[in-house]
Amino acid sequence: MFKFDRKQEVYEVGGVKFGGQPGEYPTVLVSTMFYARHKIVTDEDKGIFDRAAAETLWNTQVSLSDATGNPYVNQIVGETPESIRKYIDWFIEIDDKTPFLIDSSAGEVRAAAAQYCTEIGVANRAIHNSINASIEQSEIDILTESDVEAAIVLAFNATDPTVKGKLDILEVGGSGQTKGMLQVAEECGIKIPLIDVAAMPLGAGSGATIRSIPTIKGKLGLPVGGGYHNMASAWDWLRKFKKTQPDPKAIYMPADIGTNLVAQIAGSDFLLYGPIENVEKVFPAVAMVDIMLGETAKELGVEIADSENHPVTRLT
């Protein structure tokens, strides 16, 4: 496909490497657990869930990674400080190395999670999700005081969804912020910024989302990713059309997985692929594209890192 002239940063969190030239490293896959209305959760406020079912889901992802060579990260979503602490406790009990995103719709919950990870000594595996234009000072203060050094930096510009708008929000500010998000991240003590290009709906900036991947990597040299599956879930036509079909999921899933593959070809280093239940569908598809990217990288003179475990070697 292509090779960037600019040096591409490679960051490591919990043994997982993010960044580099397209095809140099296997694409990182980020699952989501304990999301809103996740069927394994019985009480979202107290963090009560089916531990056996959760572990089965997690072990499936581990097995798929072993088969393909694609590394993985877990996105832990909590709606209260109590629930997210319980989810983190469960995760670090069953897995002692894998990095995880701490995520919530509430800033005070994200802040509490960053503080908790510091207290229990796992901040080196935690990735704050996210530093964005709506972040409040209270969250900034706690994140700064924490030991968390990795964060998703969101390139969401509410007033300008273009590629320029995404770069502006990262570098100079906008949407009510007088500082760029990268500066805010640096002031919070973030040493590992992972750019989320903020996937926009089809017809409302989806093209700019994909184009921003190589643009941001080319200009800033930072690892780039996103929750591209949101393009499919926000597609009004598809939502309506699938309901008219005998097997709505069969209609929906190719589009869901496909959004990730398009972004991957454009240079995305990591994919927040959504519910962990989709793990068996996404891993083989992403590994397939990684083989193509790996072959191209070799032709362009890029040395494949850990070639033995890369899909281009392992699966061919």
From Swiss-Prot:
Statement: the UniProt record of this protein carries the keyword Translocase: yes
UniProt keyword NAD present: no
Catalytic activity entry: 5-methyl-5,6,7,8-tetrahydromethanopterin + coenzyme M + 2 Na(+)(in) = 5,6,7,8-tetrahydromethanopterin + methyl-coenzyme M + 2 Na(+)(out)
Leading EC class: translocase
Alphabetic keyword roster: Methanogenesis, Methyltransferase, One-carbon metabolism, Transferase, Translocase
Entries under Pfam families matching the protein: MtrH
GO molecular function: tetrahydromethanopterin S-methyltransferase activity
EC code(s) of this entry: 7.2.1.4
Pathway: One-carbon metabolism; methanogenesis from CO(2); methyl-coenzyme M from 5,10-methylene-5,6,7,8-tetrahydromethanopterin: step 2/2
Disulphide bond pairs: none
GO BP terms: methanogenesis, from carbon dioxide; methylation; one-carbon metabolic process
Family recorded in the similarity comment: Belongs to the MtrH family.
HAMAP family: MtrH
NCBIfam families reported in the protein's UniProt record: mtrH
Cited function: Part of a complex that catalyzes the formation of methyl-coenzyme M and tetrahydromethanopterin from coenzyme M and methyl-tetrahydromethanopterin. This is an energy-conserving, sodium-ion translocating step. MtrH catalyzes the transfer of the methyl group from methyl-tetrahydromethanopterin to the corrinoid prosthetic group of MtrA.
Subunit structure of this chain's protein: The complex is composed of 8 subunits; MtrA, MtrB, MtrC, MtrD, MtrE, MtrF, MtrG and MtrH.
Protein name, per record: Tetrahydromethanopterin S-methyltransferase subunit H
Lineage of the species this protein comes from: Archaea, Methanobacteriati, Methanobacteriota, Stenosarchaea group, Methanomicrobia
